[in-house]
Amino acid sequence: MVFPAKRFCLVPSMEGVRWAFSCGTWLPSRAEWLLAVRSIQPEEKERIGQFVFARDAKAAMAGRLMIRKLVAEKLNIPWNHIRLQRTAKGKPVLAKDSSNPYPNFNFNISHQGDYAVLAAEPELQVGIDIMKTSFPGRGSIPEFFHIMKRKFTNKEWETIRSFKDEWTQLDMFYRNWALKESFIKAIGVGLGFELQRLEFDLSPLNLDIGQVYKETRLFLDGEEEKEWAFEESKIDEHHFVAVALRKPDGSRHQDVPSQDDSKPTQRQFTILNFNDLMSSAVPMTPEDPSFWDCFCFTEEIPIRNGTKS
């Protein structure tokens, strides 16, 4: 008797992904910009075309290209078959009818300062935020802290103000902010969440550039949230990145690090260039020269917030 051959579906192996793209140093040529816009969905082209500042348009474009690169290369879905949607809160997600071997596949992007960043996990809930340390546009640092007083708990402010140097205090402020935003983005609640419900116990206080640390602990309404873990890193001297991780059902996952793990991990951010972003791209729409003309009329945001050199 001859039995029919079994058909096996090869599921691509996927680990966590951490990517960053330097929007601040990217000066797209006409050919690059027109190729990029041909490689995203029409509704996203329209959205990006509405930005007043080139800085915002570049960051949004980089974010869309990173997402499509992720889905194409990690899920093996052809670039021109990828359908991205947005939730009611505006979060980009893969369309539910997509051929996805990972039912809990999760990704998140953030852009601020000079970078757009992406974190993705095959099984874990994930949120990411990046913050650039910069001086307040108006007023002194103490005045800025007074305005933001209700965003942090008393203990968090004690940690921030424990440093004598105001620049270091500002550094710690943005590190705390990135952590809170990463959690809020992971749970998808958007604006309206009371930030003082969250309290982060930072550890270590000093982070080395290029390393990833997983010691910081989260307390929600005074109770430690052990099912959550946070990866912290500095891409460069001025940019903090926080990645919030949790298994979707709330239980601990073997890939969610314990707060007792005091050693930096090797899940560092890979810095991509434009050629990396486009390595799997397939143009989906005709070339539109007017989109370049409109981009040329946008301006970079005036730099009112200085950074310490």
Curated annotation (Swiss-Prot):
CoA binds at residues 47, 86-91, 108-111, 181-185. It is found in: Cytoplasm, Cytosol. Mg(2+) binds at D129, E181. Changing R47A: Reduces affinity for magnesium by 7-fold, and holo-[acyl-carrier-protein] synthase activity by 2-fold. Changing E181A: Reduces affinity for magnesium by 40-fold, and holo-[acyl-carrier-protein] synthase activity by 32000-fold. It catalyses: apo-[ACP] + CoA = holo-[ACP] + adenosine 3',5'-bisphosphate + H(+); apo-[ACP] + acetyl-CoA = acetyl-[ACP] + adenosine 3',5'-bisphosphate + H(+). One of its GO terms (molecular function) is magnesium ion binding. It comes from the Eukaryota. Keywords: Cytoplasm, Magnesium, Metal-binding, Phosphoprotein, Transferase. This is L-aminoadipate-semialdehyde dehydrogenase-phosphopantetheinyl transferase.
